[in-house]
């Protein structure tokens, strides 16, 4: 009887260890952006120079397993008031009523609907982008690669080109271009 009790206890410990190993695997699929990451956009001003903007407050998450990228998803919420600009003199105009209208629409959001695996760490991430209360489909050309020095980190480069007028922003305002290049550069860290 003593032998059976020991066997049962060993089996219980093994089952517990296997369960915790499984939980660890689930957490390995949840990712958050590191503080070093940049989420922002570029837009031409007066047809000549490029204005760069960065969201300094971004909430994000990603569920991703490189063995099953078709099941991946990501979601971003970007605070419009947190934007900083390479040309600060344009901030009020870009955040004003004719463009972002940040006083009324505090956040911009992106929610993925599909990850298309193109091979070699390249993906098209399809989803819904909401700016100024207007939602449109957008595809981000994305590269996700394991970080060479940290197995819990993936390097990311991602971009999408949109027409700002598709999101209710007025055309021809103050020499600000129609095309906006949205970019994400940085790292995802396993949560």
What are these regions (language model features)?
Residues 14-15, 26:
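Cleavable N-terminal signal peptides
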